[in-house]
């Protein structure tokens, strides 16, 4: 451990203010603190509150973690007061203003880092915070990028950036094409790779992210080498070996309270949820959660609900706590849906204790938006996936889960949900399509049995990776040794 030989290392962590980014960064903070690293997490007051309980327990247990709050620049950026997290925005169409607001934190954060003691040895910053590039350079502190994505997606994005001219020759957004120089033959449409072809202000922001990636000292990835060995190997070549795969970071949550409150306090009583699951047969329940920023239109959500009903299988459906989904809740109540499914359907409005649910023996499938955290948590729990990607890296994650890992079934979504244009897209999978996909995942066919066996094996590999001597545990050691070596010439 680093602290056994010299004053402990001090890492400053900058999570991006979206649940899918903050949750693994807080896990990383605890993993590093467990190895003797002093940790400072920099975030805004509203976001600090979401992790208050989890971090308080960590600090009380003796982990050297400090939480420093900086004011979110609402007024200066033209953002509404109180919207300090991506999941609080009234519309995802306003997300660019939110992303760009963080550049206004550069001056106060640089001042903070100049004054903080002990002097930081390393910055770990989310890829969506390119303003930290300049701070790290000005202060001479090595900066490591945290990518909340898998190496499959990172390699794919890197290759397609290099083949930009090839992409421009493809006229249709619906035409499938193979990724060149990829370990496996995988095909996408242009609309499924939204971070590659952008224009205007979004391009400027993404160019800043790319520059930050290219100039960083290295990259931390929430994956494990045994899950995607060819993609970890090839992405390491791209980054000259400075890649540390340290996942699944969610497995640092060993206490029931930490699992239940990971990311936010759950909006359902933990005991009530477990009691409901205990009443169901092993492997019979489908868990349905489309992430913290699900942007499906009402028409599609209705079809999803009706398909779940017609599947005749028990399910837990997590419904996003956005104000816009009040219409969905009205439909659930007024159409008689809630009454019809009350014996075998559990509805959770808001935040769910996802880790507790996925690890329960009654859960036999996970209908997911394919955010990387959820994809990895499902696999880590040994639960087969029903994939419903929405945007961003999620189509890449679907390809990895279904085509490469053989750990899931596609719902049949072909088109990305463009932020601010969701209503134009409408219904992509009708209730019959939902019912059919659920049956394929949860049924007793030979393919379904083989899939369950395969994902269980992957889950076992995930747990071994984070144990002492495992690949991810060792990679944390290698990371700390690397940063310590950088400090030696300064002695």
Curated annotation (Swiss-Prot):
One of its GO terms (molecular function) is trans-zeatin O-beta-D-glucosyltransferase activity. UDP-alpha-D-glucose binds at residues 292, 352-354, 369-377, 391-394. This is UDP-glycosyltransferase 73C1. The keyword Transferase applies. Its EC number is 2.4.1.-. Keywords: Detoxification, Glycosyltransferase, Transferase. GO terms for biological process: response to toxic substance; response to UV-B. It comes from the Eukaryota. It comes from Arabidopsis thaliana (Mouse-ear cress). Belongs to the UDP-glycosyltransferase family. The keyword Glycosyltransferase applies. PANTHER family: GLYCOSYLTRANSFERASE, UDP-GLYCOSYLTRANSFERASE 73C1. Pfam families: UDPGT. Involved in the O-glucosylation of trans-zeatin and dihydrozeatin. Also active in vitro on cis-zeatin, dihydrozeatin-9-N-Glc, and olomoucine. Can detoxify the explosive 2,4,6-trinitrotoluene in plant by forming O- or C-glucose conjugates. InterPro entries: UDP_glucos_trans, UDP_glycos_trans_CS. CDD domains: GT1_Gtf-like. SUPFAM superfamilies: UDP-Glycosyltransferase/glycogen phosphorylase (SSF53756). PROSITE patterns: UDPGT (PS00375). It is an enzyme of class 2 (transferase). Induction: Not induced by cytokinin treatment.
């Amino acid at each position: 451990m680093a602290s056994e030989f010299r004053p402990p290392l001090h890492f400053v962590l900058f999570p991006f203010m979206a649940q899918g980014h903050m949750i693994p960064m807080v896990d990383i903070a605890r993993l590093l603190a467990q190895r003797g690293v002093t940790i400072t997490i920099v975030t805004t007051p509203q976001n600090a509150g979401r992790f208050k309980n989890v971090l308080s327990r960590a600090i009380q247990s003796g982990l050297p973690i400090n939480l420093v709050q900086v004011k979110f620049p609402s007024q200066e950026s033209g953002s509404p007061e109180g919207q300090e997290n991506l999941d609080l925005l009234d519309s995802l169409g306003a997300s660019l203003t939110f992303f760009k607001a963080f550049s206004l934190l550069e001056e106060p954060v640089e001042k903070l880092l100049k004054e903080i003691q002990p002097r930081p040895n390393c910055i770990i910053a989310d890829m969506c915070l390119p303003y930290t590039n300049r701070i790290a350079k000005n202060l001479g502190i090595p900066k490591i990028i945290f990518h909340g994505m898998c190496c499959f997606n990172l390699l794919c994005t890197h290759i397609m950036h290099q083949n930009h001219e090839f992409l421009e020759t493809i006229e249709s957004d619906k035409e499938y094409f193979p990724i060149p120089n990829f370990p496996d033959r995988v095909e996408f449409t242009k609309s499924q790779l939204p971070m590659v072809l952008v224009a205007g202000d979004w391009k400027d922001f993404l160019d800043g992210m790319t520059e930050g990636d290219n100039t960083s000292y290295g990259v931390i990835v929430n994956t494990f080498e045994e899950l995607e060995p060819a993609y970890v190997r090839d992405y390491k070549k791209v980054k000259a070996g400075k890649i540390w795969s340290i996942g699944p970071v969610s497995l640092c949550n060993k206490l029931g309270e930490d699992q239940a409150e990971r990311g936010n306090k759950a909006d359902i009583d933990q005991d009530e949820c477990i009691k409901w699951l205990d009443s169901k047969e092993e492997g019979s329940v489908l868990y349905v959660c489309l992430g913290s920023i699900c942007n499906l239109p009402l028409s599609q959500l209705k079809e999803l609900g009706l398909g779940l009903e017609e599947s005749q299988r028990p399910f837990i459906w997590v419904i996003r706590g956005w104000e816009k989904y009040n219409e969905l809740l009205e439909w659930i109540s007024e159409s008689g849906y809630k009454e019809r499914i009350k014996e075998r359907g559990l509805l959770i409005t808001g935040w769910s204790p996802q880790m507790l649910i996925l690890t329960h023996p009654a859960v036999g499938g996970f209908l997911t938006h394919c955010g990387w955290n959820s994809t990895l948590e499902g696999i880590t729990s040994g639960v087969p996936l029903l994939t419903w990607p929405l945007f961003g890296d999620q189509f890449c994650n679907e390809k990895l889960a279904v085509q490469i890992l053989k750990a899931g079934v596609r719902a049949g979504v072909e088109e990305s949900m463009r932020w601010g244009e969701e209503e134009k897209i409408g219904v992509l999978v009708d209730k019959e399509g939902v019912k059919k996909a659920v049956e394929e995942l949860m049924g007793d066919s030979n393919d379904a049995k083989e899939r369950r066996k395969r994902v269980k094996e992957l889950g076992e590999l995930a747990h071994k990776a984070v144990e002492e001597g495992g690949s991810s545990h060792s990679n944390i050691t290698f990371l700390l040794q690397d940063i310590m070596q950088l400090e030696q010439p300064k002695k």
